Amino acid sequence: MIIRSPEPEVKILVDRDPIKTSFEEWAKPGHFSRTIAKGPDTTTWIWNLHADAHDFDSHTSDLEEISRKVFSAHFGQLSIIFLWLSGMYFHGARFSNYEAWLSDPTHIGPSAQVVWPIVGQEILNGDVGGGFRGIQITSGFFQIWRASGITSELQLYCTAIGALVFAALMLFAGWFHYHKAAPKLAWFQDVESMLNHHLAGLLGLGSLSWAGHQVHVSLPINQFLNAGVDPKEIPLPHEFILNRDLLAQLYPSFAEGATPFFTLNWSKYSEFLTFRGGLDPVTGGLWLTDIAHHHLAIAILFLLAGHMYRTNWGIGHGLKDILEAHKGPFTGQGHKGLYEILTTSWHAQLSLNLAMLGSLTIVVAHHMYSMPPYPYLATDYATQLSLFTHHMWIGGFLIVGAAAHAAIFMVRDYDPTNRYNDLLDRVLRHRDAIISHLNWVCIFLGFHSFGLYIHNDTMSALGRPQDMFSDTAIQLQPVFAQWIQNTHALAPGVTAPGETASTSLTWGGGELVTVGGKVALLPIPLGTADFLVHHIHAFTIHVTVLILLKGVLFARSSRLIPDKANLGFRFPCDGPGRGGTCQVSAWDHVFLGLFWMYNAISVVIFHFSWKMQSDVWGSISDQGVVTHITGGNFAQSSITINGWLRDFLWAQASQVIQSYGSSLSAYGLFFLGAHFVWAFSLMFLFSGRGYWQELIESIVWAHNKLKVAPATQPRALSIVQGRAVGVTHYLLGGIATTWAFFLARIIAVG
């Protein structure tokens, strides 16, 4: 008699038709909340409607229902992303000079927007070269399209239609997985399955398919383009895929097919999977064969990683076990209980993801210029500056978001009763030590970094250049950074034997790459000026962290307000009758953190913009002499505050200020308008609620006199609403001002 183990029963992971689709309900504003659904009594109603529409925690306390709403919303988000992408590709297909740019990327600028002449604004259509008039774009899409092997506007058009189909599909999926087949809570909490699928599927197969596309489509097409073949003469992508002989003409080892792979003779593939380092001298971008190799390697790693976790079969890691095994000599219970936190609090999960993704986005910003991945990207200075600035801002916002959701987790999801002596509890118990030390670090960095500048301004004002901190007087060389640069410059042939050049030209080593008479990249010298501004970076980053971390660690309680958790995530003050307790909510810390994030990122992008114009970007003469855009003035000018104001902000603002009457005039208008938006924010930040309520009541009196008073009572913004409106306009105005300043400058001189 054979005893079989009982067959595991198949788990039912979805509920069928849980919630009916009702247009009547959707049409009712505030249907998710009993209070808001009643309709407006006062104008505060519209603010509450916006504040709570996506705060799913406030609609219900059922974790399964919250999870389904978040999951469904993600499909809506993906749908919008596909719609946006489709629009980008459609503009490339319908309104752009892509084919002209492809034939001569060094002399023709990218443009995908032509302004219609309605009130004379066709002045904005500048001459981008090749007889095309339009607005110069700085998104880098042209460079990506070339790298992926797109050779005609018809291909862009087809891709745009494909993206629309996917947008519709995602919209349908969002509806289907909420109204027709909604996953159960257990499905959302099955982290091992999620990790396996995300690692092996999204990252593994995603990278593998991209590597395949690069080898079979991008590489051959780019090889033809680099050789100067007319895009119309190049075979179409499907011809390369279906006809191996075509590829074998370019890469002879293709004739052998998969034999070298199975016989472990992998070096045969080194024609199209390379490890060269450095930049392709024709395009100024990374070698596309290096990139294909990289994606293949990444794919292997993630396909392996996607088989690491224990699911239906009893092998592999369990995440709970891994976390609970993490105990050090100083960490008490270690990560015990972390598994439960991350599977029951999506805020905690989101917080970690935002912190990682924000940091990664900033890493991307730094790699886009130091290892420019796409052809002709490095010499398109406006695009380089835009990509750096964009990724820095996005990274900053994501990191502040991480702190926001960590604080929401602390207020709404943290259960102190069953958390004892684990890592989080231990951090909370010595939060005073953490915050006071961090505060000391901020004061130290602030006084010393700013003090160096003040010293230099004073010496400069007194006419004592020999007593300044500079490369020509008292040197403060960044010796550690220079050592790291040098190590990387020496790496090829030593630590990485197969490599012919270092990972980035910025490390050093002497060689520079120029494309079409413009510098793509060269070794970036670091000196006293960089040492000074890097300490300002350290200062602003630490202050941002201080504010955000204080908000998280004191979100539930503090000496001032021991019962803070009961007041919620955002509240103006601890009730009337307790003075000095305003602006202590977790939300207020996020609010204040945003201003310091703005400070920090502004200094970074100013540093980048000036440093690149001074020491990297420029033109090269026939004799090989490089002339930089601002003639290398960074090292001597940026060491005083006065220098930053005079030689960077003022000197480089001339293009945007003098843009009227030219194709850059829109930037001049934006520069003006965004300053106005920024100034408008101060009205919300520097005035009180009572002032406005008094004003409103006299205006209501006038309406009553004329018998035109509205049924909905006007109310002044609450304290929190006023600060939210204020910080929004502050950031929007500041970012748009910087954008206009940067682009008018770099399009004019780059």
Curated annotation (Swiss-Prot):
Which HAMAP family does UniProt cross-reference here? PSI_PsaA
Disulfide connectivity for this sequence is none
| Molecular function terms from GO | 4 iron, 4 sulfur cluster binding; chlorophyll binding; electron transfer activity; magnesium ion binding; oxidoreductase activity
> Which residue ranges traverse the bilayer?
70-93, 156-179, 195-219, 291-309, 346-369, 385-411, 433-455, 531-549, 589-610, 664-686, 724-744
Question: What membrane topology was assigned to this protein in its record?
Answer: Multi-pass membrane protein
Instruction: Report the SUPFAM superfamilies cross-referenced here.
Output: Photosystem I subunits PsaA/PsaB
Where chlorophyll a is bound, by residue? Answer: M683, Y691
> What protein am I looking at?
Photosystem I P700 chlorophyll a apoprotein A1
